[in-house]
A protein has these predicted regions:
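A short, Lys/Arg-rich alpha-helix, primarily the initiator
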Residues: 1-12
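Short alpha-helical DNA-recognition segment
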Residues: 15-33
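DNA major-groove recognition helix of helix-turn-helix
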Residues: 35, 53, 64
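DNA major-groove recognition helix of helix-turn-helix/homeodomain DNA-binding modules
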Residues: 44-59
Length: 64
């Protein structure tokens, strides 16, 4: 599942959930639910995250 990729990217970049949530302008608990696969992440936030981590959307959602 791609939510694992969100976690890996965050850890690889030495970021906290709060830092990513601040960038997305959302609550840390909400971001945590995205990262844990509890809540579906909106496409607009996926685009922001792809830009933030400088990766493609395909990479982010593990589409090969």
């Amino acid at each position: 599942m791609f939510f694992k990729r969100l976690y890996e990217l965050r850890i690889d970049n030495d970021l906290t959930q709060q830092q990513v949530a601040d960038y997305l302008m959302c609550n840390r608990q909400v971001y945590g639910r995205y990262e844990n696969g509890i809540r579906e992440i909106p496409v607009s936030m996926l685009i922001k995250l792809a830009d933030y981590y400088n990766v493609t959307l395909d990479y982010l959602v593990e589409r090969e």
